[in-house]
């Protein structure tokens, strides 16, 4: 079956092949629909998937440019990878796994699952994802390098009110967003160099009132952020010194 997606990615209409899968069997489900998985460009998945299915999408679906996982549930899994410098794929239930679309240069459009809780490290690292990113409500953590070195992300970044932690280092380093950077009030942790080298962010930088920890260089080289930075009373960890300042 086919389905049109009119609103989920920058209001760009996309026609998807819709595949209902069970975890670990996406490849077989595509074959059962009489489709060649190596030639599919726009894919919408329903049902359940796991790390092995992300391996198929990342490493074997060579034409894939748009993925819609809005109605899918992600199940825990692990797929070991030791080729071409790519990382292994792993995650728990309702987590977008580690490196699941790492260096997937052809991928330009992605719709997140409604039930997503965590975006694991390097999930989209150096992929071709473009335009805006709208992280869905329910996500509580975004990990190390998830959106690192992605200059084609030249739209807006929307973070959910449920977000508690942006952890590790370089999570949005070098992203090309052009928008105001609005941090959710419930955000408690910002890791090192999280927004390093993102000059497209503009407007007043406001740290959340519940922020407890901020890492070195978190906003370094975000030269178009301005305003009088107010340090929240909840902050217990802040780097010091000219080389470690968060901005």
State the predicted function of each range.
Residues 17-39:
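Acidic Gly/Asp/Thr-rich repetitive segments characteristic of extracellular carbohydrate-active
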Residues 14-21, 41-49, 64-94, 105-118, ...:
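Structural signature of tandem-repeat unit edges
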Residues 1-10:
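Short, exposed coil/turn segments at beta-strand boundaries within extracellular/luminal domains
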Residues 99-100, 120-123, 143-148, 169-171, ...:
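Consensus positions within tandem repeat domains that build extended binding/scaffold surfaces
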Residues 52-60:
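A short acidic, amphipathic alpha-helical/loop segment
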């Amino acid at each position: 079956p086919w389905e049109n997606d009119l609103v989920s990615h920058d209001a760009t209409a996309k026609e998807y092949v819709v595949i209902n899968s069970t975890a670990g069997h996406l490849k077989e489900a595509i074959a059962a629909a009489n489709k060649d998985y190596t030639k599919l460009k726009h894919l919408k998945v329903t049902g359940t998937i796991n790390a092995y299915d992300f391996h198929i999408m990342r490493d074997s679906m060579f034409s894939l440019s748009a993925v819609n996982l809005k109605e899918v549930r992600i199940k825990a899994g692990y797929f070991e990878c030791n080729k071409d410098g790519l990382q292994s794929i792993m995650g728990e239930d309702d987590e977008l796994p580690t490196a699941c679309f790492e260096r997937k240069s052809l991928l330009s459009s992605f719709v997140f699952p409604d039930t997503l809780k965590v975006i694991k490290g390097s999930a989209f690292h150096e992929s071709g994802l473009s335009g805006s990113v709208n992280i869905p409500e329910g996500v509580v953590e975004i990990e190390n390098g998830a959106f690192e070195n992605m200059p084609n992300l030249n739209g807006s970044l929307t973070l959910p009110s449920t977000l508690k932690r942006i952890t590790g280092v370089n999570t949005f380093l070098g992203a090309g967003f052009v928008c105001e950077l609005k941090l959710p009030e419930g955000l408690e942790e910002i890791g090192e160099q999280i927004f390093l080298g993102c000059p497209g962010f503009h407007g007043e930088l406001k740290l959340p009132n519940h922020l407890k920890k901020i890492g070195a260089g978190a906003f370094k080289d975000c030269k178009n952020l301005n305003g009088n930075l107010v340090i929240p009373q909840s902050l217990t960890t802040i780097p010091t010194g000219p080389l470690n300042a968060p901005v």
